[in-house]
Amino acid sequence: MTFLENVDKAKLRKILLIVISALALIALALLLVIIVVSIAPGSLKKSDIKYVDYTVSEKDISMGTLILADDAHPFTAGQALNSTMINCQQYRNQNRGDVEKGPYYAMNNVQLTQTAAAAAHKLLVAAENAVKEDNLLIKYAFYGDDGKTVEFQTGMLMFLTDYEETKLPEGYAAWFKEHAHEYGFVESYTDAYRYVDEAHAKYMTDNKLSLADYIAYLKKETSRDTVLSLQDANGNKYAVYYVACKAGDKISVPETEEYTISGTNEGGVIVTVKITK
């Protein structure tokens, strides 16, 4: 064997070692990508939550931020909400001060649930600060609705317009489409925004899902064992799953984590778990 042949074999071994190392690094990178994608917000993953039994109440079934209300799903809990509604104009005045100055206005008889009213106030103040146009009105909500849209009865839907009650100004319309989810709202139909909570609003907006479509997706794809991993606009993380049930049934809920239950008005509930670890 010549000296040249020895040199060539040494080079070949070195090249093979480099190739093998490169392939190993590529394989490791692909594995990391798979791991990251599998746990990324907005993806399905196997649940590692420790559960306990919980008996579902009638309130759990019939109320909540994800309750479906349309012609096919009549909302029957409206009367029960009466005493808990917040007048939007009064809330605006109490939290802004001088009624002669902005931000938005609301028709005297429109109301929202306490949670939706607080979120709507933050949303509308942020909108006026960004658009800098004093011309924003809540025309319809729980009371003073249009008499046609069942969803107003939930106390979580508001219809927005200008002071002339004609249409939402273009600047506001564009801003709401981009930022409403940051405050827990999604566009139900043109210029009408429904509160669904921050945990769900970003995912629904990013994936262009109506509330009905979102519920159908959760019903098909999730369970206590397979949850949807979500992250809201503020970086808070959640695990979400659907359970088909009726009042009196036992379902699984987290033993230690903070969670909420929302009825869907179509045969089940959605459990939203706040992930802190």
Please provide the spans of the model-predicted regions.
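Extracytoplasmic cell-surface/polysaccharide-interacting catalytic and binding patches
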Residues: 2-277
